[in-house]
Amino acid sequence: MLKPLGDRVVLKVEEKEQKVGGFVIAGAGQDATKTAKVVAAGDGIRTLNGELVAPSVKAGDTVLVESHAGIEVKDGEEKYLVVNEANILAIVE
């Protein structure tokens, strides 16, 4: 399992499938955002005064993230996206 540091967040991106004439085209389209599930969040970031500011998201949250944000990593067979919390646009409720 990945444990992010600082204000980084590990996401599992929800893949969209588009069907055209019975064929499935995975990842079709160039959306500006992606929907993802938060798998893990770091402890937060420290202010100049040394105070720890906890992340706004937690494991299990569904979030909207910029489509080109972060770094894709593999943990075993699973693919995850590691992003800075600032790249998360909203929590989907």
Swiss-Prot record:
Domain of life assignment: Bacteria
Tell me where in or outside the cell this protein is found.
Answer: Cytoplasm
User: GO CC terms for this protein?
Assistant: cytoplasm
Asked whether the keyword Cytoplasm is assigned, the reply is yes
Q: Does the keyword Cell membrane apply?
A: no
UniProt-listed PROSITE patterns: CHAPERONINS_CPN10 (PS00681)
Mind telling me which SMART domains this protein's record contains?
A: Cpn10
SUPFAM superfamilies in the cross-refs: GroES-like
Task: State where it is primarily located.
Answer: cytoplasm
Example of a GO MF term: unfolded protein binding
Record-stated family: Belongs to the GroES chaperonin family.
Function field? Together with the chaperonin GroEL, plays an essential role in assisting protein folding. The GroEL-GroES system forms a nano-cage that allows encapsulation of the non-native substrate proteins and provides a physical environment optimized to promote and accelerate protein folding. GroES binds to the apical surface of the GroEL ring, thereby capping the opening of the GroEL channel.
Q: Which NCBIfam families does this UniProt record tie to the protein?
A: PRK00364.1-4
Descriptive protein name = Co-chaperonin GroES
